Amino acid sequence: MYIRVADMKENTVKTDDIHYISESIYQKIKSYTISTEDLYITVAGTIGSVGEIPKVFDNANLTENADKIVFRGICKKFLMYCLLSNFVQSQIKKCTTKVGQPKLAIVRIEDLLIPLPPIKEQYRIVHKIKQTASIMS
């Protein structure tokens, strides 16, 4: 399976139009995969979209227009919400190259400032966000 930026919607990957790649293309990009433990961030075209990988796409090949974010010791949902926050999105907007097709370089992603409270607090914040979101919907 091959995940495109067009498939990345609403902080997940849509499963209604799954794409596959040929064996020859797979051989060229077989090391560029993403797992359900990672997050994605789009880095070309639509820049700064962030989301989780559904189980059906575990170890799928990922477009070169998105990067996977691998992390340890951080609540995945907390990191996703941080990356989607106005605070981080404004940083992304400022460090996106504007020449030709807009692009967000990996080194710029590594330089993003992300608030990182203790892990227990991360889970508490995620719980509050989910509570608030359920009230609003």
Model-predicted regions and their roles:
Residues 6-36, 56:
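Sequence-specific dsDNA recognition surfaces
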